[in-house]
Regions:
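Short, strongly hydrophobic alpha-helical membrane anchors
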Residues: 1-8
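N-terminal signal-anchor/start-transfer transmembrane helix
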Residues: 9-37
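Alpha-helical transmembrane segments of polytopic membrane proteins
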Residues: 10-17, 54-56, 84-95
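Short membrane-interface loop/juxtamembrane segments of multi-pass integral membrane proteins
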Residues: 40-52, 114-132
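Interfacial helix-start motif at the membrane-water boundary
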Residues: 47-64
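Short alpha-helical packing/oligomerization segments
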Residues: 76-113
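Final/C-terminal transmembrane alpha-helix of multipass membrane proteins
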Residues: 128-154
Length: 154
């Protein structure tokens, strides 16, 4: 279906642009950092790379994930005009960003970046009460709120 809504089309193009850029970063990561595909582990290792590695490629990947998610939230808002879902989807995007900032700047544990699902284990099991872990706790709270509200409104 073709839409005449200029903002919807603009946000859709932005979303496609950011997702293509994010996919390009994944391609570069797979062939530059991993030296080729690793039989299904590269997507998990890519998220470890995004959330815990410091560098230009990982920062660009995190920002394109965040911007792509926010533009997708704006596309959904322009389709349904539901303010609650806009706020909840924005919280989900901010949760990704806060977790990335925590992992890059404030995570002080042993970084097992080459193990798949490391980013999930840190998100679920890391218990820390330092100032930097405030970002982790806010990310958890926003992510859980996002899941609950997404399930309620579906």
């Amino acid at each position: 279906m073709i839409s005449n809504d200029v903002l919807l089309n603009t946000f859709s193009l932005l979303m496609i642009f950011f997702l293509l850029l994010w996919g390009g970063c994944f391609f570069i990561f797979t062939y530059k950092e991993l030296d080729g595909p690793k039989l299904g582990k590269e997507s998990f290792l890519y998220f470890n790379f995004i959330f815990f590695k410091r560098g230009i490629l990982s920062n660009i990947s995190l920002l394109t994930l965040f911007c792509g998610y926010l533009s997708a939230a704006l596309v959904e808002y322009r389709r349904e005009f539901n303010y609650l879902m806009l706020i909840v989807n924005m919280m989900g995007g901010i949760a990704f960003l806060l977790y990335g900032i925590y992992g890059k700047c404030f995570f002080h544990g042993v970084s097992e970046i080459n193990k798949p699902l490391f980013f999930i284990r840190v998100f679920i099991a890391e218990v820390d009460f330092s100032f930097g872990s405030l970002l982790l706790w806010l990310s958890r709270l926003m992510y859980m709120t996002w899941i609950v509200m997404f399930v309620i409104n579906s």
